[in-house]
């Protein structure tokens, strides 16, 4: 078994917005461990467009689509996913609600 956790597949939302949502011992998350049963804060990275709900956590506000967002509360990530219509693909760490896009 590998000491390193595989990266989650990038989250893509119903409206086309996408972002990386990760948590492991080397990233900006709480707790900073691999394979926690649940995380309270996660690292978001490289969103496809600036997202106001994430800006308080942005490492480089002058370039919001080319940076990471540190210690983002899981409820904020869940709110971003909901705002963009839910997930159509991708993975989120335990603790983030994996809100799926509704089928019509």
Describe the residue ranges of each PLM region.
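Low-complexity intrinsically disordered segments
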Residues: 51-104
């Amino acid at each position: 078994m590998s000491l390193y956790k595989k990266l989650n597949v990038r989250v893509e939302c119903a409206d086309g917005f996408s972002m990386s949502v990760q948590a492991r011992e080397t990233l900006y998350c709480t707790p900073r461990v691999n394979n926690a049963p649940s995380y309270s804060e996660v690292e978001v990275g490289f969103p496809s467009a600036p997202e106001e709900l994430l800006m308080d956590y942005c490492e480089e506000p002058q370039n919001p689509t080319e940076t990471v967002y540190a210690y983002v509360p899981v409820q904020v990530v869940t709110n971003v996913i909901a705002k963009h219509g839910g997930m159509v693909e991708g993975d989120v760490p335990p603790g983030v609600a994996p809100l799926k896009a509704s089928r019509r």
